[in-house]
Amino acid sequence: MPLVYSYNSNKGRKEKNEDAIAVMKNKQGEVLAVVCDGVGSHSNAAYSSNYIVTTLEKEWQNLTFANFNNMKNWLCDKIEKLNLELFNKSQEKNKKMGTTIVTVATFDNQVVVYNIGDSSAYGLTKDNEISVVTVEDSFVGALISAGAITQEEAKTHPERHVLTQALATRDNINLHTFIDDLSKYDYFLLCSDGLTNMIENEEIQDIVRNNELSISVEKLIELCVNRGGVDNISVAIIKNLGGVNHD
């Protein structure tokens, strides 16, 4: 399935950017997008996020897969191995590490989304719907799931940044998985919580559907910055062309 993409990251009003982001193709032209948001309370947050993204980017570009299951199993195993690698490194050096992760990967007409933490992926369908396809590993995410608070209340909750799960913080992880037919979607959008905490789903839909990809990315980031930009903001958008592939 032919895909094009654009992505960028902005440190917002923070002193440094602890997000890491990349979108790349393998030798078969299949796309992997990844966003990692280093856990700010950990001293090696930026190292954790950059290490994950750089490693996945380097390895994906040189791979070919026999089928969708082969691809998704490789990616799942790789994320779990990277988690253990960073966790062991943090124990050996007595340095705290931690990062969220969200990935979107394609093969033929199928897509798989993996996530840990509170970085998100949205699917914009051909029926003009938008939905979050990730599971939020946070204290407020658990409250939302339990029906204790609403999505709107979560945005101002005093413990909204408390994660219940992140990479590199323990030796085993519960990787959330979403699988669907790629043909149902016009776009996938990945982002750190610097975007999700500052913008509504309807605004994402309006901007993405009415602009070129690179302009959409910049407009989304600019909107968040103008609203305070208190966190790093990273956005990647993948567009399903349904025609001839273009880089």
Question: Which residues does each PLM region occupy?
Answer:
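PP2C/PPM-type serine/threonine phosphatase catalytic domain
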Residues: M1-D247
